[in-house]
Amino acid sequence: MRDGQQSSFATRMTQEQIDRCLPYYPEAGFYAMEVWGGAVPDSVMRYLNENPWTRLEKIHDAVGNVSKLTALSRGRNLFGYSPYTDEIIDGFCRNAIKSGLGIMRIFDALNDVDNVKSTVKYVKQYGGIADCAVCYTVDP
């Protein structure tokens, strides 16, 4: 629900389109299903005029406990383009877990551990699983 539509449709699948796909996901029985990443919350609000929290809640309601919902977060930048204060990170993580997110995969493009600490702390505090990632490239 995240990468395919992000790569192929510029994160512009409407809630109605997602709703048509949802009945198939519980049957698939995935351990986890990534629903948010990079630009999803921003694009949902900016281009579709939809509520990303409602989207997360509807997906969670449809999938239930069959699959954990996951998100890819940019550490201190969360899903935005600038670093946020701990108060913003706290509220965002609290609402994400409350709305059905089970796992947040967290990275910093510069692999600066200080930029992921707050997000890890709050995800765990609210009962989610913090899944940290490291960025790397293979130089030709």
Model-derived segments and spans:
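A common structural microfeature
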Residues: 6, 30-32, 66-70
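Acidic, glycine/proline-rich low-complexity segments that act as flexible tails and inter-domain linkers
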Residues: 2-11
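Active-site beta->alpha loop and helix N-cap motifs at the rims of alpha/beta catalytic domains
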Residues: 37-140
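Conserved, mostly hydrophobic/aromatic
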Residues: 4, 25, 106
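Ordered, soluble secondary-structure elements with a strong preference for glycine-centered loop motifs
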Residues: 11-12, 83
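Anaerobic metallocofactor- and corrinoid-dependent redox/one-carbon enzyme cores
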Residues: 15-19
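Terminal or standalone catalytic/regulatory effector modules within metabolic enzymes
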Residues: 20, 24-44
